[in-house]
Amino acid sequence: SYENTDDLAETARDADELRIFYHIKNQVKYIDGSYEKYTTKFLKPDIAELKFGKISSKAYTGKVLKPAVIVKDGKKKLVNGTDYTVTYNNNKNIGTAAITITGIGEYRGTKTLKFKIVPPKTTLTSKTGKTSGGWNRATLSWKKSAGADGYQIYYSENGGNFKKLTTVSSGKLSRSVRYTTGDTEQFKVRPYKKVNGKTYFGAWSNIITLN
């Protein structure tokens, strides 16, 4: 404890960073000459008030996923096991996973972060041909995405914005489309899965261009 507040002020001026985790004993002198002692308590920093790195969505693998956590107190990067501990929940299946960060050492409190586990990205291929009516035809095929309920197919005409063409079930891994010679049509697909009323989309596949 500091008995001399001048010493404390001088220390604060000289230091780049001053952290006090102890009780400071002080006393107040009243007009009648009596004194009353009191203690000021300085708390450790609450880890929930620090900065955390963003955790992006992770592709489902069938195994537990433990993305790294980044915690910063100003410019200082905290150390797992020294400044905080980490526990993971619901971090295996497609859905929303939780990370609980608990302050230790010079830090207190907890912070919960969340990240999505989504169906893995698929790969799109095409095989071209002709219809009986003379139209150009292509069969779009893609690899199965583990855990997906189905797939969304989007298309773009002549460089325009992508629009949804159709949605197919998980049991179907191809789609026949028609296109016009001279036009440029592009296609892409992404898997999805519904969990507790919420839809989780995987990343887009590569883009197939037909012209």
Walk through the language-model features, giving the residues of each.
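Beta-strand-rich modules
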Residues: 177-198
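Recognizes extended acidic, P/S/T-rich segments that occur
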Residues: 152-182
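Pro/Thr/Ser/Gly-rich low-complexity, intrinsically disordered linker/stalk tracts
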Residues: 119-147, 198-211
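Serine/threonine-rich, repeat-prone extracellular segments and beta-strand-based repeat modules
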Residues: 1-42, 76-110
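Solvent-exposed, low-complexity, repeat-rich "mucin-like" stalks and linkers
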Residues: 1, 43-76
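Surface-exposed loop/edge segments in extracytoplasmic proteins
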Residues: 76-81, 160-167, 203
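Interdomain boundary/hinge segments at the C-termini of tandem beta-sandwich modules
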Residues: 38-44, 115-119, 209-211
